[in-house]
Amino acid sequence: MPAFNRLFPLVSLVLIYWASVCFPVCVEVPSETEAVQGNPMKLRCISCMKREEVEATTVVEWFYRPEGGKDFLIYEYRNGHQEVESPFQGRLQWNGSKDLQDVSITVLNVTLNDSGLYTCNVSREFEFEAHRPFVKTTRLIPLRVTEEAGEDFTSVVSEIMMYILLVFLTLWLLIEMIYCYRKVSKAEEAAQENASDYLAIPSENKENSAVPVEE
């Protein structure tokens, strides 16, 4: 069961990828909010366009706010992705899609100081013949960095339930074995008693015990 819980997110992503390849759709999947120190962390930001065939000028801005601090720019996409001067410089990697519906970034070698609030701003200016509407979307990602990977609560509950089920099945099988053993033992004892009683009867009594046949 824990293995299924660990494989379920992977299977879901595979299905989403397969659907996106077979059918061009956009799915706004929320980002994970927990990272482990020293590992890369993908900050997922997806902003779907309802009409993909419409051309649009897209600008992406990533901000970071430490606990008790203020927002400051760490990454910008404007006619090409570029990293700005910040404490994250050299550790950010563009992970977006070509159509700029997925504008995610990856933080390399995550540290404990990277905990905080990340903001993804996506600004689009659509190019229609009559007008050029402007749309802005915002995604907030509260990130918590830990020293070691924590155990998933669902996996813990699944493991506990699995062990309880195994104990219950073991006890049930043990009770069934004891019940069957006693039942067989009683049947053997009854058979032995009947055989002993039959052997204890004298031969004369055995002949007399026969029922006479009336003429």
Swiss-Prot record:
Intramolecular disulfide bonds favor the voltage-gated sodium channel oligomeric complex assembly. N-glycosylated. One of its GO terms (molecular function) is transmembrane transporter binding. The chain crosses the membrane at residues 157-178. Coiled coil: none annotated. PANTHER family: SODIUM CHANNEL SUBUNIT BETA-1 AND 3, SODIUM CHANNEL SUBUNIT BETA-3. It comes from Macaca fascicularis (Crab-eating macaque). Residues 23-156 are extracellular. Residues 24-138 form the Ig-like C2-type domain. Keywords: Cell membrane, Disulfide bond, Glycoprotein, Immunoglobulin domain, Ion channel, Ion transport, Membrane, Signal, Sodium, Sodium channel, Sodium transport, Transmembrane, Transmembrane helix, Transport, Voltage-gated channel. This is Sodium channel regulatory subunit beta-3. It comes from the Eukaryota.
